[in-house]
Amino acid sequence: MSDQAQTSMNQYLTFTLAGEQYAVEVGKVKEVLEYTSVTKVPRTLEFMRGVINLRGSVVPVIDLRLKFDLGETEKTIDTSIIVMEVEISGETVVLGTLADSVQEVIGMDSSQIEPAPSIGTSIKTDFIQGIGKQEDQFIMILDIDAVFSEAEISVVAEHAEPAR
């Protein structure tokens, strides 16, 4: 068997948070939106910025920078909302995550991805699926299903409609 047949190529959407490169599997991403006004929801988690109306569906919007203790996302011309499907305990929830900017879709095979380090990252490593190497930069590949606890997702899901 050739080396190419043994490595699997995966597609990732890359984006920035606080100057660092992150990525999520394209299969988790439903769409990318320009930043739009977010309706605040009182008495909710600090990192939940509010909800948006997405073609008649209520979608909660999460600030990943706040979740990762990187400070609040500032709205700029590049700020985007990445609409994703997150699965926890067998339930799929659609939510939007704020990104400072969305970069591109890249392909990486398993040889370009190292296991998450236990030190030296600004976020807890159980959120990190691995560290991708693309040319001379590192990209933290998030396991978006592990970013939120079951309790956090249940609070967020109260403001969302079920995934279709």
Write out the residue ranges for each language-model feature.
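An acidic, low-aromatic, low-complexity terminal/linker signal
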Residues: 1-164
